[in-house]
Design a protein with these regions (language model features):
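Catalytic alpha-helical scaffold of carbohydrate-active enzymes acting on polysaccharides/glycoconjugates
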Residues: 2-173, 178-217, 242-265, 271-312
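A conserved mid-domain beta-alpha-beta active-site/ligand-binding segment of alpha/beta enzyme cores
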Residues: 220-251
């Protein structure tokens, strides 16, 4: 049943729950921090259907050189296309090598276009026993409020089915392109068998959402700490990102002595997979891995553990 609106809430998608009022959360082996690394594998469309709302960062400005809206759609966005293609041709392999080095199984967010057209990347993930989650249709085609409920249902279903076909396993996690949802999205995801969603960056622990049917949990990604928003749009240098990610972990680790926290690191191969940036990811992962009490997990493993705990 949907949550009742109450103190602190202006929607009924999940209950109001201050972290200080919750039971203590313990991760496996009494770890302080659960670390998950989500890597977006995305395709930037050469062309998109007419009147398609295109991806624009919440911080302002398009991801490529052009917005795709008149008059800029008179020619393809080669800049945006090239950036994302670089990630799938080159950058992803640097990220996977760094994750291998520290024994981290990735959670790979696939959009439909990647699932359909990049079987080599699927195989690389399968070699590492990665978890694959659904990530919309493409980087430029996002969920938006102009969709009817049935249009959004078909969008979600097409994404899920593409990942299932490409990987041989139906995904149970969802990461919306550009973190975009409508008020229908959680209900539609749960109805399609999705168990967790990564769009709600409002907590440091998982929590149960309240769809009309099915069961859905939040594994929140803090958008302003992902490599795109903090580095490119946030105009932080890569050295600053390195420091901020370490300080993020240090804060979670300190608070995790009292109750478990999670660090969901959200990465884009075309950004952090560049040769002058990858060293900083390696250093951050090395710093996190040097601490006792860190549980390295996939998104699904974190949700499975959380679900098995006493009623929260």
């Amino acid at each position: 049943m949907p949550a009742k609106r109450a103190y602190g809430m202006d929607q009924d998608l999940y209950p109001w729950s201050p972290i200080v009022t919750r039971p203590v959360l313990r991760w496996p082996d009494n770890a302080r921090v659960a670390l998950a690394v989500i890597v977006n594998l995305e395709h930037w469309d050469w062309e998109v259907p007419a009147n398609t709302p295109l991806a624009v960062s919440p911080l302002g400005g398009p991801e490529g050189l052009w917005t795709g809206n008149p008059p800029d759609n008179r020619f393809p966005d080669i800049g945006g296309y090239g950036n994302h293609e670089y990630g799938n041709r080159v950058g992803i392999f640097r990220i996977l090598a760094a994750l291998d080095k520290y024994g981290i199984r990735p959670t790979l967010a696939l959009d439909k276009a990647v699932a359909d057209h990049y079987p080599f990347l699927i195989k690389e993930g399968q070699k590492r026993d990665a978890e694959f989650i659904a990530h919309g249709l493409s980087r430029r085609r996002i969920i938006h409020i102009g969709m009817s409920e049935d249009e959004e249902r078909q969008y979600i279903r097409a994404s899920i089915e593409a990942v299932a076909k490409a990987t041989g396993k139906r995904p149970t996690g969802w990461s919306g392109p550009d973190f975009q949802e409508t008020l229908n999205t959680p209900n539609l995801l749960a109805a399609e068998g999705i168990r967790y969603v990564c769009d709600w960056g409002n907590d440091e622990q998982p929590y149960k959402m309240t769809p009309k049917t099915g069961e859905l949990y939040s594994l929140g990604v803090h958008a302003y700490l992902d490599d795109n928003y903090i580095h490119l749009h946030g105009r932080r240098t890569i050295n600053e990102v390195n420091l901020l990610w370490r300080e993020w972990f240090e804060g979670l680790y300190a608070d995790g002595a009292n109750t478990g926290r999670m660090m969901v690191l959200h990465l884009h191969p075309w950004i952090i997979g560049q040769p002058w940036r990858i060293r900083h990811l390696d250093e951050v992962l090395g710093h996190v891995s040097s601490h006792a009490g860190v549980w390295k997990a996939t998104g699904g493993e974190i949700i499975d553990w959380f679900k098995a705990q006493p009623v929260r």
